[in-house]
Each structure stands twice: as C-alpha cells, then as structure tokens.
C-alpha cells in the first residue's frame, strides 16, 4: 500500500473488555496495509492498573491519552474507533488532542454531546434497564464513602443473551475467560464539566448502528444520533453488540471506507 493510502487506526474497547476483542479487525486492517493499535484502558486486558487506582475518567483513559500524546506533529492523524462505553474515553481523548484525530467512529458506542455531562448518555440508558435485565452481571462500589465510584463485571449469561447472541461461540468463550471488573463511567468518575465545542466538538464523528444490539438497543443508538448528529451514519443491520465478532468483514469494509473519505 502506498504511504498516502496507509491510515492509522486506534481501537478502543468497551466495558469489561480489552484490546483482545479487536483481534479480527486488527488482523484484517493490517492485512490490507493499515497501521492498527488496539489499546487496553486502565485495569483492562493486560493493563496492570488496579481498579482502586482509577479515581477519575482521565485515570481510566490514561493508556489512550499517553498513546496520543506520544504522536508527533509529523505523524498522521488517527482514526479513533470506539466501541460501546469506549465512546466516552474517545470523546475525552479528542477533547484533549483534537488536532491528532481525523475522525471518531462510534461503533454502537455511547456518543456524548457538548451540552450535558460526559456520563449523561450512559446513565440515561442504564437507568432505563430493570435490575433483572442485567441477569448475572455483578455491580459494586469502591473508593470514598462520600463520593463512591461504581464497577461492573458482565456475567456469562448476560454476555450470551445480550452481547454475543449472534457472534461465534468461540468468541463468547474467549470473552468469558478474559473480561475484567471495570469502572462504570458515572458523574463521580467523569466529573461535572462537559466536553468542549473547541475540542471534541471540532472532530468529525461517524456513527455505526448495529441493528441487533441487545445491550445498546437500536432505538437508543438513533436517539444519540439525533441528540448530537454526526457527519455520517452507517449501519450493520445483522450485527449484535459485538460487531467485531459477529460481522467483522462488514465492519472492516466500513472502516476502510471511512478511512478513504475522512482521513
């Protein structure tokens, strides 16, 4: 691939997952000549940070922020691909480093706006889910009693029913072995300052809707799109929440298309 056509992708995972969940996408994009980095956020994947060390959203996003900070002015802008709750770390990264990001791709991801608090789009959905809907997912709190932080660990039944229901069983089994306890992005973690129009608001955003997502339902994905319209909306109609497993080839085709148009 000619240098001008070679793009740099940075992949950001969602809640309880890690860089490992991008293995199919990374392999495919690198095979066609692109540069791909999949990031483990703090206390995720093989990152050794302990949950108790994560007191702020910046703490959780530290590996992503360090990666972007390491890029020089001569480096190409990155295409930031964020999945699920990874949309909020991606928004923070673009708020801090808008000049280093060509576009953010929100893959059935929580897409914050610049009016409400960073955690708003996540908490709005979570409040609508009845407790029994979480099945065997474990929730808890940590940190200071007067300002508690929250964590979650997806249970295998919840993953099978709501995240991986259309994905290969091998990938579900992989996830059962590799998911970790992660902080939930609440106001106590993310703070009370909205993302800025001058930072996050200037970065091109693309949203990929997953039509069979049982965790972030399609109607909620469209609500976020209406709430803070992106540059373009694409769809993978038969993808579950884990589109990188259930529809990897379609997802990669869309990412290559986005790279050609916006990077």
Curated annotation (Swiss-Prot):
The active site is at 84 (acyl-ester intermediate), 213 (charge relay system), 241 (charge relay system). It catalyses: methyl salicylate + H2O = salicylate + methanol + H(+). Belongs to the AB hydrolase superfamily. Methylesterase family. Methylesterase shown to have carboxylesterase activity and methyl salicylate (MeSA) esterase activity in vitro. PANTHER family: METHYLESTERASE 3-RELATED (PTHR10992:SF1007), METHYLESTERASE FAMILY MEMBER (PTHR10992). One of its GO terms (cellular component) is vacuole. One of its GO terms (biological process) is salicylic acid metabolic process. Its EC number is 3.1.1.-. It comes from Arabidopsis thaliana (Mouse-ear cress). SUPFAM superfamilies: alpha/beta-Hydrolases. Esterase activity is down-regulated by salicylic acid (SA). InterPro entries: AB_hydrolase_1 (IPR000073), AB_hydrolase_fold (IPR029058), MES/HNL (IPR045889). Pathway: Plant hormone biosynthesis. Keywords: Hydrolase. Pfam families: Abhydrolase_6. The lineage of its organism: Eukaryota, Viridiplantae, Streptophyta, Embryophyta, Tracheophyta. One of its GO terms (molecular function) is methyl salicylate esterase activity. This is Methylesterase 4.
């Amino acid at each position: 691939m000619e240098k001008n056509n070679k793009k740099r992708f940075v992949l950001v995972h969602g809640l309880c997952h890690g860089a490992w969940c991008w293995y199919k996408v990374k392999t495919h994009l690198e095979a066609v000549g692109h540069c791909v980095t999949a990031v483990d956020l703090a206390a995720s994947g093989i990152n050794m940070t302990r949950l108790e060390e994560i007191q702020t959203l910046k703490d959780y996003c530290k590996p992503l922020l360090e990666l972007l900070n390491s890029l020089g002015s001569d480096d190409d802008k990155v295409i930031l691909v964020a999945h699920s709750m990874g949309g909020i770390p991606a928004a923070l990264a673009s708020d801090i480093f808008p000049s280093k990001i060509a576009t953010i791709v929100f893959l059935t991801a929580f897409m914050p706006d610049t009016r409400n608090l960073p955690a708003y789009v996540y908490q709005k959905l979570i409040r609508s889910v009845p407790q029994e809907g979480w099945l065997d997912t474990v929730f808890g709190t940590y940190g200071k009693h007067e300002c508690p932080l929250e964590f979650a660990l997806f249970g295998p039944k919840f993953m099978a029913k709501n995240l991986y229901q259309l994905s290969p069983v091998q990938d579900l089994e992989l996830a059962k072995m590799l998911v970790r306890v992660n902080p939930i992005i609440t106001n106590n973690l993310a703070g009370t300052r909205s993302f800025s129009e001058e930072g996050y608001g200037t970065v091109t955003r693309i949203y990929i809707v997953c039509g069979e997502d049982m965790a972030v339902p399609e109607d909620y994905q469209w609500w976020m799109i209406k709430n803070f319209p992106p540059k373009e909306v694409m769809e993978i109609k038969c993808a579950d929440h884990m589109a990188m497993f259930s529809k990897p080839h379609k997802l990669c085709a869309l990412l290559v298309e986005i790279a050609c148009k916006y990077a």
